[in-house]
Amino acid sequence: MAAAAVAGVAGLTSGAGRKRLLREEDMTKVEFETSEEVDVTPTFDTMGLREDLLRGIYAYGFEKPSAIQQRAIKQIIKGRDVIAQSQSGTGKTATFCVSVLQCLDIQVRETQALILAPTRELAGQIQKVLLALGDYMNVQCHACIGGTNVGEDIRKLDYGQHVVAGTPGRVFDMIRRRSLRTRAIKMLVLDEADEMLNKGFKEQIYDVYRYLPPATQVCLISATLPHEILEMTNKFMTDPIRILVKRDELTLEGIKQFFVAVEREEWKFDTLCDLYDTLTITQAVIFCNTKRKVDWLTEKMREANFTVSSMHGDMPQKERESIMKEFRSGASRVLISTDVWARGLDVPQVSLIINYDLPNNRELYIHRIGRSGRYGGKGVAINFVKNDDIRILRDIEQYYSTQIDEMPMNVADLI
């Protein structure tokens, strides 16, 4: 493994084309622990991409590839199996979207790439990025997700889709019904692989994988890749290229992390109300560990005359989509959510994350707070810590080699 230091990177957010520059001094501290044969391709022009794809990349607002894009895209295009780990907010989604689009034969109206994601929202966002980047290619791409009409899925798949992005359950269902034909699939991408391969999705991924042609290329992308996950990759990857960030560098440099000591659960609500008074928030996400807590807190905040919106996995798909749309557009400014929101959803203007509950596992911590300063933007994360949570907080600090200080009085100035 060779370690390559990373120079400053320009990254971009969603189709609105907001430019966010990762500060150079931050990026030099991130070390990629990478297979020796991986070289750096500094521009999109030198990646050997097709013209119509390049047009889409520049039209989308990208100028210079991010660190992960400079390393991974060329390897994926070459046909290598790739394990890519990159900080939250450094352009992971576009990394595999560009690679997938480059490898398609548009003339062949069959599914050639399959992208699996742990949540419906993430699968939907991947589809949007694919369609935007592939705008000049006439690419057909479908999001195959639970909570939507099965008949519509079947109709779209019968029409012919070059790429299918989806959640494992629905994708497997479509393969079993023979609506999603797998014979032309060349590439399988697992996004947020740590979450996907955890107990809940492991079986479903294996079910899907069994139906794919034996020579299918596999790419695994995630912000965290714990050791036990890497062991599992041996089962369905051949001589993979590794593009890894050292674990303790994964906390984003631009994010200031604080804790507020609350002795008991009941005190959290008052603390949150006090914070509302002192913080002029641009946009904020408040995380709770359970759907019930999200509903309870939302109701309590509204009773206290605070305007909030909320989202969790039990809500109907249509409702979740409209809540996300409102939040993305800035129409709603505070979102209370479970971890369904924490994975890979781009809302560039979020500058504050509050962990009303500390996450149940330490890997989720980075997914949550990595949201609040995407592409090196400034962000603040505030953790509400009960007496019996101190141990968990110290564990998170140690795991990410970071420091979480007590929240200062002037926290509003940092946002």
Curated annotation (Swiss-Prot):
Key words, A-Z: ATP-binding, Cytoplasm, Helicase, Hydrolase, mRNA processing, mRNA splicing, mRNA transport, Nonsense-mediated mRNA decay, Nucleotide-binding, Nucleus, RNA-binding, Spliceosome, Translation regulation, Transport
Which biological processes are named by the entry's GO terms?
Answer: mRNA splicing, via spliceosome; mRNA transport; nuclear-transcribed mRNA catabolic process, nonsense-mediated decay; regulation of alternative mRNA splicing, via spliceosome; regulation of translation
InterPro entries hit by this protein: DEAD/DEAH_box_helicase_dom, Helicase_ATP-bd, Helicase_C-like, P-loop_NTPase, RNA-helicase_DEAD-box_CS, RNA_helicase_DEAD_Q_motif
Q: Where does ATP bind?
A: 64, 69, 86-94, 346, 371-375
Q: Where in the cell is it found?
A: Nucleus; Nucleus speckle; Cytoplasm
One Pfam family linked to the record: Helicase_C
Q: Which Enzyme Commission number(s) are listed? A: 3.6.4.13
Intervals of motif DEAD box: 191-194
Residue ranges constituting the Helicase ATP-binding domain according to the UniProt record: 73-243
Kindly state which reaction or reactions the protein catalyses.
ATP + H2O = ADP + phosphate + H(+)
The sequence motif named Q motif is recorded at 42-70
| GO-annotated cellular components | catalytic step 2 spliceosome; cytoplasm; nuclear speck; nucleolus
Residue ranges of every copy of the Helicase C-terminal domain listed in the record: 254-415
Primary subcellular site in the record, as a coarse category: nucleus
- List the GO molecular function terms: ATP binding; ATP hydrolysis activity; mRNA binding; RNA helicase activity
Q: Which family does it belong to?
A: Belongs to the DEAD box helicase family. eIF4A subfamily.
- How is the quaternary structure described? Identified in the spliceosome C complex. Part of the mRNA splicing-dependent exon junction complex (EJC) complex; the core complex contains casc3, eif4a3, magoh and rbm8a.
Question: What functional role does this protein have?
Answer: ATP-dependent RNA helicase. Involved in pre-mRNA splicing as component of the spliceosome. Core component of the splicing-dependent multiprotein exon junction complex (EJC) deposited at splice junctions on mRNAs. The EJC is a dynamic structure consisting of core proteins and several peripheral nuclear and cytoplasmic associated factors that join the complex only transiently either during EJC assembly or during subsequent mRNA metabolism.
| Protein name per the record | Eukaryotic initiation factor 4A-III-A
Q: Which organism is it from?
A: Xenopus laevis
Q: What gene is behind this protein? A: eif4a3-a
